[in-house]
Amino acid sequence: LDGWPVALMASDPFSYGGGWTADTCRKVEKFVDTADTFHLPIVYLADCPGFQIGLEAEKNGTIKEGVKAMSAIWQTATPWCSVIIRNAFGVAGAAHKNGGRYCTRYAWPSGRWGSLPLEGGIEAAYRADIDAADDPDAKMAEIEDRLNKLRSPFRSAETFWIEEIVDPRDTRSLLCDFANTVAPLREPGLRLRMMRP
């Protein structure tokens, strides 16, 4: 970006909707460690609806591998810039920032994030209310309408969950600014990592 090397990580919504599988988590851990070893700032174009769920995910140890990937992200000393393109839900969706040095988070207006997407989450969270209603479909629509009013990305931006909601057309120039800003932070030397789960 603007002549500076960076490590670019992006989600693939065509593979499991962008959800993190055990294999994805292992790739993320290795990628982040490699970028950190070579002092490359990380740019993450995030579209992650969370960890993959189900019997196969359980058998493959998705959560165990996910904790290791998130530990790698959190331990990273290299600067980090995330752009939430679309989805950032659940624990895996929250894995878009490091725990240390310089970290900037942008979101497109299309970005949606939180602990659980409304689609599918409403039935789980409001099952008793929906079942007790005379008209379950109407109750479901009422709950969806109420929650959709709270879903705006501007609410999260106002509480500083992200730094700025940006026009997608400005993304490259913002990322170039990021690369130039963090260039002086590149320091040669050994990266030490703590133990991971």
Walk through the language-model features, giving the residues of each:
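Ligand-binding clefts of soluble mixed alpha/beta catalytic domains
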Residues: L1-P197
